[in-house]
Amino acid sequence: MEKYDYSELGLKAGLEIHQQLDSKEKLFCRCPTLIRDIGDSDFEFFRYLRATESEMGEKDRAAVEQTKIRRKYIYKAYDTTCLIENDEEPPRELNKEALDISLGVSKLFNMKPVDQMHVMRKIVVDGSNTSGFQRTAFLASDGYIETSEGRCGIDSLCVEEEAAQKIEEKGDSIVYSLDRLGIPLVEIATAPDIRSPRHAREVAEYIGMVLRSTGKVKRGLGTIRQDVNISIARGERVEIKGVQALDLIEDIVRREVERQLNLLFIRQELLERKAFVCEEIYDVTGLFMDTKSKVLQKGVKKGSILAALLKKFNRLVGKEVQPGRRLGTEFSDRAKTAGVGGLFHTDELPNYGITEKEVQAVKDAIGAGPEDAFVMVADEPEKARLAIEAVINRAKEAIEGIPEETRKALPDGNTAYMRPLPGAARMYPETDVPQIEISQEYFDSIKPPELLTKRAKRFASESGLNKELAEKVAYSRYLPLFEILLETYTKDANVNSTLIARTLVGIVPEIRRNGVETDNLTDEHFKGLFAAISNQEIAKEAIQDLLTALAKEPELTVQEAISKLGLSAFDPEEVENFIKQMVMEKGDFIKDKGPSALGPLMGIVMKEYRGTVDGKILSHMLKKEIDNFIGQG
């Protein structure tokens, strides 16, 4: 049961899906799309970035805010990166493979391609691109998908280069890795047709399914990211970036709606109180020269403790806007953009070693009354000033309502401030890459892949897989291998579709859950495994043990692993003699239990021959001997 009636609230939401493509080369250079270990980096360099004017003489507001603090950006480079990633050389032509994949995706979304594709530069000054901009190209528009809530428009599909990956922050420096920079990705933007949290998840799941249907997208953490645009009636558009887990999308939408409703409540309360924000910044450093608060002692040492007066804000700064987050948290997020650790406000004081007497001293110094609040920042003078100015601006926005902004998704479903929404000044033409013609003939030559949903139904109807297994295989990373193996063993007596599927999506995950790294298993390992089963060299009961051994020692061949585990072909006469001997020894037990003795005795036989002889063969041989023994009795 949903907490809110989203249609009554006027919820409008849209998604932007960013998916890395699994092309051989990067988008504007011929470097491989390999993800490297940071320890493999063999050199590094650094940059300082600043906001520049667009062709119209304007500066993007998000870029201006991000460059208020001078940050050093350090880039880790590899033997698989080149001068283009370093921004020391112009880009090459756009990757044809990436373009073909993207056009195939556009067909699955019923989109119309542009006649001529132009590459643009999108200003990005958070350090994630060495050049200070990201290259992007608008490829297709006017698409749609059908959902349980009706048709959802797909407004645009762009081809972009991936950003560098942030490794760590060290003071005023941020370290990035260049292995990811330039990997091709598609950005798919829906229309604001999403009407509820569940609908948002449904749309995201469908888009993800379409992308995986290509077989040409990267998989794993960080290879796909969802951004969510949300607004409600009387609110403003807020963009939430970096939702990596599909399970989080519903919570993100619910909690953003809750945040906006609470901000509107705070706004109404502030208006009724006739609240306002004082422009003056107060230096209260002298009031804390003898403070016992360790946090403020550091502020005194750094040189500055500044305060701002919020008239009629008392008890509203501590008002919760999302679970565990308050209006004061929103103020703190803004302060942190200046490089400070956070702030203090009256709704949480006295605390942190700050006494009631010290709180009153600040109130007296700045003229705060019982209905007022104040915020306080302690840091180096310039950082503290920028931080308190940011808080003053955010407090003013609280009186106006909901600010348009870009926020980042947090692991618990909440969000935190990142930067203002970018404006039109963010984008300008890329002059180093020529336009690309998309002719009707070229577009018609692109054949869209079969959707995974259709493929799963085909596996169920044609290959005899049950629905659950068919869906698991269709959506798994082993889909291409499954289809190869299925074709190889179509008429094999010992290897069928169910065995192949259970191995790939049942046994392999089980091995992984046991703590063994299964990424070491190659297609050749699986091909060798099923060849051995087909040739009756091993039984299917040996699959888990054999794959575990290969995962631990991937340099082994299947035959070498079989020998090492002692899983050689069985001698039927030897097995028959073993079973006859056991039946004679367990004669009294068989006389007592009759045919039901089969189960317990089967355990003894399997313990001896598991992985060497197929269980069905052993069961048949044992039953035959038990029946003979009972018949002779």
Curated annotation (Swiss-Prot):
GO cellular component: cytoplasm
UniProt GO MF annotations: aminoacyl-tRNA ligase activity; ATP binding; glutaminyl-tRNA synthase (glutamine-hydrolyzing) activity
Protein biosynthesis among keywords: yes
PROSITE patterns: GATB (PS01234)
Entries under Gene3D superfamilies matching the protein: 1.10.10.410, GAD-like domain, GatB domain, N-terminal subdomain
Catalytic activity: L-glutamyl-tRNA(Gln) + L-glutamine + ATP + H2O = L-glutaminyl-tRNA(Gln) + L-glutamate + ADP + phosphate + H(+)
GO BP annotation list: glutaminyl-tRNAGln biosynthesis via transamidation; translation
SMART domains: GatB_Yqey (SM00845)
EC number: 6.3.5.-
Pfam families assigned to the protein according to its UniProt record, in alphabetical order: GAD, GatB_N, GatB_Yqey
Keyword tags: ATP-binding, Ligase, Nucleotide-binding, Protein biosynthesis
Subunit details: Heterodimer of GatD and GatE.
Biological role stated in the UniProt entry: Allows the formation of correctly charged Gln-tRNA(Gln) through the transamidation of misacylated Glu-tRNA(Gln) in organisms which lack glutaminyl-tRNA synthetase. The reaction takes place in the presence of glutamine and ATP through an activated gamma-phospho-Glu-tRNA(Gln). The GatDE system is specific for glutamate and does not act on aspartate.
Family: Belongs to the GatB/GatE family. GatE subfamily.
Protein name: Glutamyl-tRNA(Gln) amidotransferase subunit E
Organism name: Methanosarcina acetivorans (strain ATCC 35395 / DSM 2834 / JCM 12185 / C2A)
